[in-house]
Amino acid sequence: MAVKKPENLSFEAAIEELDSVVNQLESGDLPLEDALKKFERGISLARAGQEKLTQAEQRVEILLQADDNAELTPFDGQDD
């Protein structure tokens, strides 16, 4: 089975795979070359996930701007 490009995965699938990659890297059982490949894949998955979140945030802002009565507050992306 071919590995999908991160940008072609759903957000949920990318996060699930990223979680798996992190677990494999944290185990410390991978040979160096395999660990580097997993790390590269993890970076790609994280970037794709961040891009999907950014796109979703922009869509929400556009939808809220369409409602003239809605109060817009900037999204800071940080938990309290």
Swiss-Prot record:
Q: Where in the cell is it found?
A: Cytoplasm
Q: Name one GO cellular component term.
A: exodeoxyribonuclease VII complex
Q: Please give the Pfam families that the UniProt record associates with this protein.
A: Exonuc_VII_S (PF02609)
Quote the InterPro entries the UniProt record gives: Exonuc_VII_S (IPR003761), Exonuc_VII_ssu_sf (IPR037004)
Tell me the first and last residues of the signal peptide.
none
EC no. given is 3.1.11.6
Keyword entries, A-Z: Cytoplasm, Exonuclease, Hydrolase, Nuclease
From the UniProt record, give one GO term of the biological process aspect.
DNA catabolic process
Q: Which GO terms of the molecular function aspect are on file?
A: exodeoxyribonuclease VII activity
* Reaction(s) catalysed (UniProt annotation): Exonucleolytic cleavage in either 5'- to 3'- or 3'- to 5'-direction to yield nucleoside 5'-phosphates
Protein's job: Bidirectionally degrades single-stranded DNA into large acid-insoluble oligonucleotides, which are then degraded further into small acid-soluble oligonucleotides.
Q: How does it assemble?
A: Heterooligomer composed of large and small subunits.
Question: What family does the database annotate?
Answer: Belongs to the XseB family.
Protein name, per record: Exodeoxyribonuclease 7 small subunit
Source gene?
xseB
